[in-house]
């Protein structure tokens, strides 16, 4: 089992944790339906970049 040789300082611990923060989801409004969706993803009704790509 690995054990550290020296104690990590508060600064080094904080620098390591600086990448752990969560970011909010990037949402876009569809041009045709006006529906909110995740960026680079198909909307719930099957539109992507203004075109119907999924037929249900």
Curated annotation (Swiss-Prot):
UniProt entry tagged with the keyword Cell division: no
Q: Name one GO molecular function term.
A: structural constituent of ribosome
Which intervals of the chain are annotated as region Disordered? 1-26
GO biological process, alphabetically ordered: translation
On whether Protein biosynthesis is a keyword of this UniProt record, the answer is no
User: Which keywords appear in this protein's UniProt record, sorted alphabetically?
Assistant: Ribonucleoprotein, Ribosomal protein
Kindly name one Pfam family recorded for this protein. Ribosomal_L32p
Which NCBIfam families does the record associate with it? rpmF_bact
Quote the PANTHER family the UniProt record gives: 50S RIBOSOMAL PROTEIN L32 (PTHR35534), LARGE RIBOSOMAL SUBUNIT PROTEIN BL32 (PTHR35534:SF1)
Say which family it is in.
Belongs to the bacterial ribosomal protein bL32 family.
The protein's name in its UniProt record:
Large ribosomal subunit protein bL32
- Source organism: Shewanella amazonensis (strain ATCC BAA-1098 / SB2B)
Q: What is the lineage of its organism?
A: Bacteria, Pseudomonadati, Pseudomonadota, Gammaproteobacteria, Alteromonadales
